[in-house]
Amino acid sequence: MRQTADLYCVLGNPIAHSRSPAIHARFAELTGERIRYERRLLPIDGFARGLRDFAAQGGRGCSVTVPFKTEALRCATACSERAQLAGAANTLSLHADGSISADNTDGLGLVADITRNAGIALAGCDVLLVGAGGAAAGVLGPLLHAGVRHITVANRTLAKAQALVQSHSALAALRKTQLKACGLQAPLADFDIIINASASSLAGADVPVPASVLRPASLAYDMMYGPAAQGFLDWARRHGARPRDGLGMLVEQAAEAFWLWRGLRPPSAQVLAELQEAAAKPASGADR
């Protein structure tokens, strides 16, 4: 039995809002693992140095949140296909020989939350992915692997949506999924699942797509959680859709990171249920 707890952290700026320490502490408690998991606020230009300092202190792994996910991938000596395709990493594993492995568990977390926690099969679904930034890039690959029938990436800047689609075109062809890009002003069909990966929730802006994209009982999923997602969820509810925020995605992506680090699958559904039970309390809501 280990006498000292292994050290992990979440790196970001801002970082005070992060629920990751509480989630990983609960995972450790339920699995009997001895870990210490901290928040670490880094200067905007200080990610590489902060990562080196953490490694020098014996750190075993770290979660990475905004704005450092792209830089985290560059700092790694090896990366998963998921991270490479996304162009960003949210999970780093630090090894005894000084090497660093990068992965991106965001999309796995999203797929797990939709399929296991919400009970919705993704195979054969038509999906609208709103946004073409880092959040969208992190989930597009796993959505393709999940066997969806069609994905439309809609973004205010059409060129960004087109670039994201182009970077995933080979995988889409392999998975026999129709994948296309459009601007937010383009006519849109209706969809089984609408995923908001845009910054509209954080900005408090109106939902960037019309209600006509919704089918009866469509899943309307905001990757944010708590107050940040409320406007989108209210919009979905008003139009007869099934609203869901990204709290389950947060827990499930953390569970994937825990498995990468510890080789154990934590009881993520139990931890999510505990967080949902406390959902009536005020919650900040954005990222890892």
Curated annotation (Swiss-Prot):
One of its GO terms (molecular function) is shikimate 3-dehydrogenase (NADP+) activity. NADP(+) binds at E81, G131, A132, G133, G134, A135, N155, R156, T157, L158, A159, K160, M223, G246. Its EC number is 1.1.1.25. One of its GO terms (biological process) is chorismate biosynthetic process. It is an enzyme of class 1 (oxidoreductase). Pfam families: SDH_C, Shikimate_DH, Shikimate_dh_N. The active site is at K69. Keywords: Amino-acid biosynthesis, Aromatic amino acid biosynthesis, NADP, Oxidoreductase. It catalyses: shikimate + NADP(+) = 3-dehydroshikimate + NADPH + H(+). Pathway: Metabolic intermediate biosynthesis; chorismate biosynthesis; chorismate from D-erythrose 4-phosphate and phosphoenolpyruvate: step 4/7. Shikimate binds at S18, R19, S20, T65, N90, D106, Y225. GO terms for cellular component: cytosol. Involved in the biosynthesis of the chorismate, which leads to the biosynthesis of aromatic amino acids. Catalyzes the reversible NADPH linked reduction of 3-dehydroshikimate (DHSA) to yield shikimate (SA). Belongs to the shikimate dehydrogenase family. NCBIfam families: aroE (TIGR00507), PRK00258.1-2 (NF001310). PANTHER family: BIFUNCTIONAL 3-DEHYDROQUINATE DEHYDRATASE_SHIKIMATE DEHYDROGENASE, CHLOROPLASTIC, SHIKIMATE DEHYDROGENASE. This is Shikimate dehydrogenase (NADP(+)). It comes from Verminephrobacter eiseniae (strain EF01-2). The lineage of its organism: Bacteria, Pseudomonadati, Pseudomonadota, Betaproteobacteria, Burkholderiales. The gene is aroE.
